[in-house]
């Protein structure tokens, strides 16, 4: 399944979650798009709830179904809770951590920064958004990319960097000090439903 490239706000409303991270998509119309307005949402079946939860998380991280399922399967081979491990692996993606650093306003924009070669890990350029960052690795903006307007604008509006990243705004770099804990990740996601979906 290809990555979704359509209207992000419409998709956010359909899934009932802010994919941009700003919450603006749901401020005026916190219901699915369509001619029937807020009264059109039907009660979902158990399968429907599981599918919706999977789609929420997949679109939140901007992944194809194949990438998403591969990461899910890898999480299942780790000790501990399958769902929590899955969330932690998703959070360790390079494009996501660039977004968490505040170098981009959305994960989609962060993925573009990585794709276009503006990001390094431990000094080496990495242009693979799905690259899994390991604890104690350092993520930086390439020196020749420091003046990018999109990065400067994103830094100006960002006021939160999670505790598992130590960010130096002057150097535009951060160290991924540890894996995220489940309590630090999206509270609106019920990963148990996703485990149930793939276990059917």
UniProtKB/Swiss-Prot annotation:
Described function: One of the primary rRNA binding proteins, it binds directly to 16S rRNA where it nucleates assembly of the body of the 30S subunit. With S5 and S12 plays an important role in translational accuracy.
Protein name in the entry: Small ribosomal subunit protein uS4
Cellular compartments per GO CC: small ribosomal subunit
Subunit structure, interactors included: Part of the 30S ribosomal subunit. Contacts protein S5. The interaction surface between S4 and S5 is involved in control of translational fidelity.
A Pfam match: S4
A GO molecular-function descriptor: rRNA binding
UniProt-listed GO biological process terms: ribosomal small subunit biogenesis; translation
Keywords: Ribonucleoprotein, Ribosomal protein, RNA-binding, rRNA-binding
UniProt superkingdom: Bacteria
Classification of source organism: Bacteria, Bacillati, Bacillota, Bacilli, Bacillales
Family recorded in the similarity comment: Belongs to the universal ribosomal protein uS4 family.
S4 RNA-binding domain span: 92-152
Region (Disordered) residue spans: 22-42
Family matches, as InterPro entries: Ribosomal_uS4, Ribosomal_uS4_bac-type, Ribosomal_uS4_CS, Ribosomal_uS4_N, S4_RNA-bd, S4_RNA-bd_sf
Entries under Gene3D superfamilies matching the protein: Ribosomal Protein S4 Delta 41, Chain A, domain 1, RNA-binding S4 domain
């Amino acid at each position: 399944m290809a990555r979704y490239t359509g209207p992000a706000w419409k998709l956010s409303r359909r899934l009932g979650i802010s994919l941009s991270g700003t919450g603006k998509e749901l401020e005026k119309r916190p219901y699915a798009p369509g001619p029937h307005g807020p009264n059109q949402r039907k009660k979902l079946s158990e399968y429907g709830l599981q599918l919706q939860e999977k789609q929420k998380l997949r679109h939140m991280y901007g992944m194809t179904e194949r990438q998403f399922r591969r990461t899910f399967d890898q999480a299942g081979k780790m000790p501990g809770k399958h769902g929590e491990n899955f969330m932690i692996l998703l959070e360790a993606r390079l494009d996501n951590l660039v977004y968490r650093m505040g170098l981009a306003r959305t994960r989609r924009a962060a993925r573009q920064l990585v794709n276009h070669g503006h990001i390094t890990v431990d000094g080496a350029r990495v242009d693979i958004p799905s690259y899994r960052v390991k604890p104690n690795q350092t993520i930086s903006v390439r020196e020749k990319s420091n003046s990018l307007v999109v990065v400067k604008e994103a830094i100006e509006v960002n006021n939160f960097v999670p505790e598992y990243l130590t960010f130096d705004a002057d150097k535009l770099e951060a160290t991924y000090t540890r894996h995220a804990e489940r309590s630090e990740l999206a509270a609106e996601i019920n990963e148990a439903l996703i485990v149930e979906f793939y276990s059917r």
